[in-house]
Amino acid sequence: MWCPTSSGSHLIRRGLLGAAIVCAGMAHAATDLSFESADAVNEGPLQFLVSLPAKPVHHHQNHIRIEPDSLASGWVSLSQCHDHLDAVPSAQITFREGFVRDLRVNAFSHIRDAWIEGSSVQLRQVEPGARLCLSAQIRALRNTGNGYFNLINGPYMRKFLDGYYPMRVTLAVDYPAQILTLLDITPSAQPGLGIVEQPGAIRMEAVFEGELQTMIQFERD
């Protein structure tokens, strides 16, 4: 897939689990009044932010459900929403081919049109305050052998040229606690990254600049 990255465009990428790449069309990409100036771009490594910026930022929300049969197949259920998408004439959310099925657009607002095209969601005329929700089956649970499993999510980024704008990510993972035990979450909780754990459920909330990738490790009981 071709993604413009010249001046006036911006690029948001996701990895295997959210597996989405959001490529905004070039024309008028920086005309949104809520779009931050280039001075706000962070060119350094991952940096967690202890508070949200004053202006609304892109909020990416993933809800993953691991079922008992996911351990054999690797397929998990994904519900995904995006709030405060940047205003652009066109964009697409693209999933890794062969790792997504049953992709659907469930709801959208402040977007003229949204439709499925292959393994992607195509967007047209994204306005300020846009919201998009979709669902799919994602092949994202990896069996690493000897009863261990990894769920890798990301990298998330809100990229502009060679730097990054602030982004908010919420990740919820539900898993069968009767057959899986949570071993570890990377990165660990810290200012700007909150993690809540209970048997069968994980909740993560991050505000950051840069590229964020998470890994959740399980052991089969």
Region annotations inferred by a language model:
Residues 2-16:
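Bacterial N-terminal signal peptides that target proteins for export
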Residues 14-25:
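Bacterial N-terminal signal peptides
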Residues 30-69, 161:
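N-terminal, polar/Ser/Thr-rich
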Residues 41-43, 87-117, 161-192, 197:
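Solvent-exposed beta-hairpin/edge-strand motifs
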Residues 64-69, 81-82, 120-126, 157-159, ...:
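Beta-strand-rich interaction surfaces with strong enrichment in secreted/lumenal proteins
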Residues 76-84:
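Short, well-ordered beta-strand segments enriched in hydrophobic/aromatic residues
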Residues 104-151, 198-212, 216-221:
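A surface-exposed beta-strand-loop module
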Residues 119-191:
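Surface-exposed, acidic/Ser/Thr-rich flexible loop segments
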